[in-house]
Amino acid sequence: MKKILLIFFIINFSNLSFGSIKENIINNLRNTDNLSFDFEQNINGKIEKGNCVIEYPKKIFCNYNVDDSKILVSNGRYLVIKTDNNILYRYSLERTPLNYILDKNFLIDEIQDLEEKIIDDKFINFKILKDDNEINIFFNSTNYNLIGWQTLDIYQNLSITYISSLKINQLIEKNIFKLPASN
């Protein structure tokens, strides 16, 4: 009888510790308040690099490596891109695919209902179709961390963002999500 109980507990313990791919990704997202990372972005063949901080929900600050003057920032309602020429472009966040990418609760709800696609045993992909947006979200198959996304941007350009040097739940300055003032 003791052997049967031992086998039962071993099987149940292994099932608990090794949940499904979706469960692991969802738990990882639930436990994430913010992300800091380096990125490489490819928009129709034009490659830009920099670093970003995401704070859930819906806040992002990215500093591009273009003369250290191009930034992208969202305060949760608006998205502003300040170019290296000091020109500001302001958008309603809800009109961009970032509205969904920056909302971890939306991602969790979508992932629960979607079928994952495993790519080369290294990446996990979920394709989200929402409000005429196609968003592909990619996770690492080893640690279930976010590693990038692919969208059509507000100009219908294909945008691919790769994440590296990811840090989770770091102390961040709250004022970095303040929108830059118009000239």
Model-derived regions, located:
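Sec-dependent N-terminal signal peptides
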Residues: 4-13
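Boundary at the C-terminal end of the N-terminal hydrophobic targeting segment
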Residues: 16-19
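A short, Trp-centered hydrophobic/proline-enriched beta-strand micro-motif
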Residues: 27-47
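Short, solvent-exposed coil/turn segments at beta-strand boundaries
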Residues: 31, 53-59, 74-77, 120-121, ...
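Short hydrophobic/aromatic-rich beta-strand segments that constitute the beta-sheet cores
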Residues: 39, 60-64, 79-82, 126, ...
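An acidic-aromatic
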Residues: 52-100, 159
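Flexible, surface-exposed loop/linker segments and immediately adjacent secondary-structure boundaries
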Residues: 84-123, 128
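Gly/Pro-enriched, hydrophobic low-complexity segments
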Residues: 109-183
